[in-house]
Design a protein with these regions (language model features):
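C-terminal helical cap and adjacent loop that interface with cofactors, partners, or active-site loops
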Residues: 35, 54, 241, 245-258, ...
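N-terminal Rossmann-like dinucleotide-binding module
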Residues: 3-91, 250
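A structured beta-alpha segment of the ubiquitous adenosine-cofactor-binding alpha/beta core
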Residues: 91-119
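Predominantly a Rossmann-like dinucleotide-binding segment in NAD(P)-dependent oxidoreductases
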Residues: 28-36, 47-50, 164-172, 176-273, ...
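Glycine-centered tight beta-turn/hairpin loop motif at sheet-sheet or coil-to-beta transitions
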Residues: 286-290, 313-314
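Beta-strand-loop-alpha-helix segment that lines the small-molecule cofactor/substrate pocket
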Residues: 122-123, 127-178, 192
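Short, solvent-exposed loop/turn and secondary-structure capping segments
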Residues: 35-40, 55, 86-90, 128-132, ...
Length: 387
């Protein structure tokens, strides 16, 4: 049948003795993909090497558990060819396997020696790159958020459904879903021990991460790709690029998506791009449940990155629970207590190898990104926006 044909078309994974070799391509060779220009001084330094470094670390952790697997980086793509070449050199791949330009991702992904693709470009490109990877039989790590607008969300959901048909794994960069503290709270909620969520608030209030200047005579395309973090067209605004983490926790814990949102937003302090400084919105999840969503990128202000929920039995953060009389509620569960940026890749590798649950987070992350898009549009326009 079609499933058998899809499996037959997938590249066979390499072996080194009894060790499975997972061959990886990276599309987007900046800080999130490969740790930027940072070079490791020891194996313990791989945590500073972006998603690819985390994938390599994850394989090493699984080896300690008796799952014999290693990661081999084989191809790199970036809009800026010099970034792809630098990443290839850093990770020991041939210079010929580094590709630049807007279509370099095709050359990096569509190779018989690639099993998994790490997608860490600006958000605008995530749906197209994910769909291309899935169409070519590759497993995917897609950094959050995964779109900047409704058409991108729909394409990401379609790619996720195609991946499910092909039994291809997708893990997104919503690492809180792989973090022990959050998993303990989610488990207790699902078991009814913490009651039903009645409302809450989620926050990402922090500084402007960075701004890239424009060179003389630099093209719009080059400048946008370089300074993407500050342009809504590339990033979806910081509510999609950053605050999506916290919105995703609300969706995950509540177990459904909001029906509508109204919001306000401001821009007064940004020195680059076209994004807002901050957003504040009210997500209506139905059944009387409202979540306040607040995010801000303004330096030298009171910062807060957290989640808060009130149930009929407890007061919750993302990782803890207290009774209404403010006594700690013990949380129990057998979840690994390691860096969640590594654990998400451990879970991806186990899904690929059939050593753990099959994971396909594409649609869930697309829907959380859609919530960010909704709130952004509500703030930009002053209108109520429905899912």
């Amino acid at each position: 049948g079609s499933l058998a044909a899809a499996v037959a078309a997938m590249p066979a994974m390499a072996q080194e003795g009894d060790v499975r070799v997972i061959r990886a391509a990276v599309v987007g060779c900046g800080g999130r993909g490969v740790g930027g220009g940072y070079k490791p001084k020891s194996e313990q330094d791989y945590y500073r090497m972006g998603a690819l470094g985390n994938l390599i670390q994850a394989a090493a952790e699984l080896a300690k558990q008796g799952i014999k697997v290693k990661v081999q980086p084989v191809a790199f793509a970036d809009y800026f060819l010099e970034k792809a070449k630098a990443a290839a050199e850093k990770f020991g791949a041939p210079a010929a396997n580094a590709f630049g330009g807007a279509n370099g991702y095709k050359q990096a992904i569509d190779r018989p020696d690639v099993d998994v693709v790490i997608l860490t470009t600006p958000l605008n490109f995530r749906p197209r790159h994910t769909m291309f990877a899935v169409q070519h039989g590759k497993h995917v790590f897609a950094e959050k958020g995964v779109a900047v607008d409704a058409p991108g969300v729909r394409e990401m959901i379609a790619a996720s459904k195609l991946a499910a048909e092909k039994k291809l794994s997708i893990v997104c960069g919503t690492q809180r879903r792989h973090q022990r503290g959050y998993l303990l709270v989610k488990k207790a909620l699902d078991e009814g021990k913490l009651g039903t969520i009645l409302g809450g608030a989620v926050y990402w209030n922090g500084d402007v991460p960075w701004v890239a200047g424009r060179n003389k005579d630099e093209s719009n395309a080059s400048y946008l790709c370089k300074n993407w973090l500050n342009f809504t067209e590339l990033s979806g605004d910081h509510i999609c690029e950053q605050h999506v983490h916290n919105i995703d926790v609300a969706n995950w814990f509540i177990g459904r998506y909001p029906k509508t949102v109204v919001a306000v937003g401001t821009r007064a302090r940004r020195v680059s791009g076209n994004q807002y400084d901050g957003f504040s919105g009210d997500f209506d999840y139905g059944e009387g449940v409202h979540i306040h969503s607040m995010c801000r990128q303004v330096n030298a202000c009171a910062n807060n990155v957290s989640e808060f929920f009130r149930t009929d039995k407890a007061i919750l953060t993302g990782t803890s629970a207290k009774s209404l009389d403010k006594k700690w509620i013990p949380l129990e569960g057998d979840f690994i207590d390691l860096n969640p940026y590594v654990v998400e890749h451990m879970d991806l590798l186990k899904s690929i190898l059939g050593k753990g649950p099959y994971l396909n987070e594409g649609e869930a992350c697309a829907m959380s990104t859609a919530c960010g898009v909704m709130l952004r549009i509500a703030a930009y326009t002053g209108q109520m926006v429905a899912m």
